[in-house]
Amino acid sequence: MENLIIYKPKNKEELKKLTDDENINLYNIDTSLIKDMSALFRESKRKNFDGIENWDTSNVHDMTAMFKDAHYFNKDLNAWDTSKLKKISFMFFNACNFNKYPDKWNLDNIKEAYDVFNNDIDINKLPINLKINLYYEDFDKMKDIDIKD
């Protein structure tokens, strides 16, 4: 039952109800209709995020604060299709355990990327495509920046 699609929410509100219920396996949610995932897991107490790495994010435009203050979140999201993504401000801010930086994301359409990560992050650990797309405000707060290929 792990990879069986059971739920197909039509909007963010329906998706939020599903993700707030820890008895619902994230593998079982088809997110292909969702355009807005902003604050979806903000301050979430959920401990099991298995299956989120397989979500269909091809229509998502907004992931603002999606994992902000989600202290247990730490999944590899490199498989996500981010080609339509425009907003990622505060996306991983204060997600204290998160360290699987998405280095394969398409960020060509990003318009807003304020404080995506915590202020004390070691920017040298970020992939080059994320370094280039972060706003000056993020860079100004970080120390010892060394951008290399």
What does each model-found stretch correspond to?
Residues 1-149:
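Negatively charged
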